[in-house]
Amino acid sequence: MAANENRLVWLDMEMTGLDPEKERIIEVAVVVTEPDLTVVAEGPVLVVHQSDSVLEAMDNWNKSTHGKSGLIDKVRASTLTEAQAEQQLIDFLSQYVPAGKSPLCGNTISQDRRFMFAYMPNLERFFHYRNLDVSTLKELARRWAPAVYKSFEKKSRHEALADIYESIDELKHYREHFLKL
């Protein structure tokens, strides 16, 4: 399939915490869609190895959440480095979207971009500098159309691929019920 500069790349990461100066990436996934949000391709879900000391330094919320999902065990078993994961994602995305064309798409993606800047800078540069952040519409709907905001129920599984599909569904919800097209 030829690369198309109008496609959108959705990304989600799970991290050991929120501070890229102290925390690390443990899972990353991507999905490519057409501008109308139909899925073109689902990328690999990559679990990145981190040391026991990094995992043990997680706060209780992260230990509980990533422990219940099984992610901590997957991280310990993984041999994939951040650099290897970064290259696999760039190789995958390059098949569908030219570098520098897609905004980074997802929910609260400034956080993902901060971690990419710190640990996957080549992947960060693959994206356009613009963002398509579904959380912007969520915050506007919460203030301007509370019924629309409340009518989308998030599962918040904190699994990278599931969270991407939930973000796409949430944007479809706002497109249908909030935006006047």
Curated annotation (Swiss-Prot):
Domain Exonuclease: 8-171
EC number: 3.1.15.-
Keywords from the UniProt entry: Cytoplasm, Exonuclease, Hydrolase, Nuclease
GO molecular function: 3'-5'-RNA exonuclease activity; nucleic acid binding
Keyword Aminoacyl-tRNA synthetase: no
Any one Pfam family match given in the protein's UniProt record, by short name: RNase_T
NCBIfam families in alphabetical order: PRK05359.1 (NF003765)
Known role: 3'-to-5' exoribonuclease specific for small oligoribonucleotides.
Protein name per UniProt: Oligoribonuclease
